């Protein structure tokens, strides 16, 4: 699921703006709520719905209003959001029954093998120039750090602690990702500041605060649900 989700996201990004991709991908918060509710035959609480709405709005608009026109790339990105939602739900299910470290290691190995196979089957894995680029100065180390730190250890922490959260809570927390990316981009001068950063980031932050502080008050057994 993780491999297919990231692959479809990259394919979609080839033909749409990053802001549109961010908005459509953020729909995984909504899909997580829908699928979880359908599976449990129970509607989310009002607090959860408010948190989902704020998180989806914030993640989608932190880079400004998306200029959305529906095409193949947009539908592929929506499919990516569904896959991310399923990944969150299946992670919740399996890590409550299996060792999270083993699950993380297996997932990382499977994704690595699938990604490597994709490079050679449909990419330019046979082009020596591409490999020379990867092993050139200033490229290899960031690639390794992103793979080990940005992927494996993030996946490990996700699997270790997500089992203690309701899937919708987890999805809303994950939606904070564009906030950190935007802050990092601002620090490096890669992103221009706009009022939408405050609006989108604020909506995400408020959505998380509302869910974390009020969901257990409204339903004390919430985090015990699967």
Language model features with spans:
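C-terminal-most transmembrane helix of multi-pass membrane proteins
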Residues: 139-141, 149, 175-226
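C-terminal transmembrane-helix exit sites in multi-pass transporters
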Residues: 9-11, 28-50, 179-199
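Hydrophobic transmembrane alpha-helices of multi-pass small-molecule transport proteins
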Residues: 44-64, 80-84, 115, 195-215
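Specific transmembrane alpha-helical segments of multi-pass solute transporters/efflux pumps
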Residues: 1-25, 59-62, 147-165
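Structural signature of hydrophobic alpha-helical transmembrane segments
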Residues: 11-28, 72-83, 137-148, 202
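Hydrophobic/small/kink-forming positions within alpha-helical transmembrane segments
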Residues: 2-3, 7, 29-34, 82-85, ...
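Hydrophobic alpha-helical transmembrane segments of multi-pass integral membrane proteins
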Residues: 47-54, 72-79, 90-91, 95-148, ...
């Amino acid at each position: 699921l993780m491999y297919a989700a990231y692959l479809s996201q990259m394919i979609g990004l080839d033909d749409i703006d990053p802001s549109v991709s961010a908005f459509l991908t953020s729909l995984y918060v909504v899909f997580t709520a829908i699928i979880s509710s359908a599976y449990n035959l129970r509607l989310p609480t009002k607090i959860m719905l408010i948190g989902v709405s704020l998180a989806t709005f914030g993640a989608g608009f932190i880079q400004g209003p998306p200029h959305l026109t529906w095409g193949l790339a947009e539908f592929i990105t929506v499919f990516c959001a569904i896959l991310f939602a399923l990944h969150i739900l299946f992670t919740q299910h399996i890590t409550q029954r299996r060792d999270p470290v083993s699950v993380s290691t297996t997932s990382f190995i499977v994704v690595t093998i699938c990604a490597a196979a994709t490079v050679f089957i449909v990419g330019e894995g046979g082009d020596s120039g591409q490999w020379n680029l990867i092993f050139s100065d200033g490229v290899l180390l960031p690639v390794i750090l992103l793979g080990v730190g940005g992927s494996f250890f993030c996946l490990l922490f996700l699997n270790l602690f997500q089992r203690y959260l309701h899937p919708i809570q987890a999805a809303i927390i994950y939606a904070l990702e564009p906030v950190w990316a935007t802050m990092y981009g601002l620090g490096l001068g890669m992103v221009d500041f706009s009022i939408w950063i405050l609006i989108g980031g604020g909506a995400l932050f408020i959505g998380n605060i509302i869910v974390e502080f009020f969901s257990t008050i409204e339903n004390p057994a919430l985090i015990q649900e699967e």
